[in-house]
């Protein structure tokens, strides 16, 4: 790809945001919900694992689609929900924690290759410091967003996330997407916990 990834940064854990509140304990409770997802085979499989009817849609269309009832909900990290003011057109956050969303600090590989070994080491160290500060702030922000949205009247559902994890993994396996992963990758990811 011609890039050097310096460090992953934590963007947030993706949660479900619903237009109308409902009792949600597991994926079966979301059956029939038209949920906005970014699109693509992986996102569609993930959404089906959540129990919803996936509705691919660009993020700029989500606020209007929620306000008119075109979709019943969407999923994103809490910071994205708040930045887009989705609490104005929704009633509930369902803390499914179905995906941890990273972003990556990267540099063009031709530029990286022009740096001295010392400058490369300094860039990597600075990226690590920045990622640590970001990650700590994002985790604290997520807690404050839940508290803030609950204070504004949004209902917060805390379902059994193990039920969602099991359903999503079954969907990935049956879709054939997991088979495309390098051998042992899933097991390595599971060990990160």
Describe each model-derived feature in a short phrase.
Residues 3-193:
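N-terminal secretory/targeting leader peptides
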